[in-house]
Amino acid sequence: MSTEFNQVNKLKKTPRRNDNLNEAKFVERLIKISRVTKVTKGGKKLSFRAVVVIGDENGKVGVGVGKAEDVVNAFKKAKTDGRKNLIDVPITKSLSIPHAVIGDLGACKIIMRPSIEGSGVIAGGAVRTVLEVAGIKNVIAKQLGSDNLLNNARTAIVALESLTTLDEVKRKRYHKSVL
């Protein structure tokens, strides 16, 4: 009797923690692949580092970094790292950002401003990739300081994280009794 019960339990599929992330269709864009070397007393050990932006083009975006001995595994590791670092971005009806924002991280500084419908993404480098994968279609962005692709992508994520919607501002500003 107990053996039958154990067999039935083995057949049941347990829900996984990240199953809902696998259902959504994510877009992965490779920003950079670089060959890196670790020098030891035995010689040089080559490996590859991949920087990937992952998002659903509907308000979710993340940046991931992966390192492995071959390019394919580095890309896979970067994708899983990007899925772990997903953030939600508020997008307006005109597929822009709600307000102007400045992202600051290390030596990188990024200024983003909303733009009118039809203007497109006016940005360069990694910032453009992050905005496109997030699903933002009309925005103006300027990157200042460092031109490092990984740092600029992370700074763009910091800037997008600091965006707030009108409802969030109302909740912060007013007491619950007023709303």
From Swiss-Prot:
Keyword match Plastid: yes
Pfam families tied to this protein:
Ribosomal_S5, Ribosomal_S5_C
Task: Provide the leader sequence positions.
Answer: none
Please classify the protein's predominant subcellular localization into one broad category. Answer: plastid
Q: Which GO terms describe its biological process?
A: translation
Q: Which residues form the S5 DRBM domain?
A: 26-89
Q: Name one GO cellular component term.
A: chloroplast
The entry lists its GO molecular-function terms as: rRNA binding; structural constituent of ribosome
The source's domain of life comes to: Eukaryota
PROSITE patterns for this protein: RIBOSOMAL_S5, S5_DSRBD
- PANTHER family in the record, alphabetically? MITOCHONDRIAL RIBOSOMAL PROTEIN S5
| Record's subunit section | Part of the 30S ribosomal subunit. Contacts protein S4.
What does the record say about domains?
A: The N-terminal domain interacts with the head of the 30S subunit; the C-terminal domain interacts with the body and contacts protein S4. The interaction surface between S4 and S5 is involved in control of translational fidelity.
Q: Which family does it belong to?
A: Belongs to the universal ribosomal protein uS5 family.
Q: Which NCBIfam families does the record match to this protein?
A: rpsE_bact
In UniProt terms, what function does this protein have? With S4 and S12 plays an important role in translational accuracy.
Protein name stated in the entry: Small ribosomal subunit protein uS5c
